């Protein structure tokens, strides 16, 4: 009797299992895929599309424009004549986003992977090339941010130094040391320039003698972000976004706070090193 009961019990369980599987099969037949896994597009989109740009802006000069990160570019779309200039490669070029500068004497200034700064003319012929780093510093592969102020080149690096360099011959005018490196573009306004360092401090320096005129401290995360920050000037205000996404507007003359607002959630504070900020543009 006990064996018969056990047999019937097992038969009942197996029958139920079979019924459940039948239900699952019916459900699978009637099911529909709502979300599909995205596929990587390997083909170039709009490969035949051609855009001719005569002028990017109207009424705004290119040199010294402070209303966006890199300035406005007026150019002709005739590439029949090309030139090249070879220099040692820069580590993590796309990540660091280094930018060359156009000077008011119709030349270009940039740097190479060893920290050498060079000036070339319109035909990319070298005018001068200098390097003011020690052998040990060269191995660190400094990233340099450049700007022009009158007859000076301002060269700030991610090692903690700002060099003021003579535009004509590349000679060193003055070297300024900071407590930490810099990681933003440089903006020049009248006789001062502005830059942000790794501690989320915006600093204002004199273009005449390199003295610090004022600074403004914003919230500083424990983990330092190496991503380049954005800095612009509009009217009498300087705007910058720090590594945790806070957008700040300051009085350009004395650094007093005009307003400040976060652009990210509070959770971003813990993940500041993964935050990728956009460039500021007016």
Segments (PLM) and residue ranges:
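Extracytoplasmic beta-rich repeat domains
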Residues: 21, 44, 59, 81-102, ...
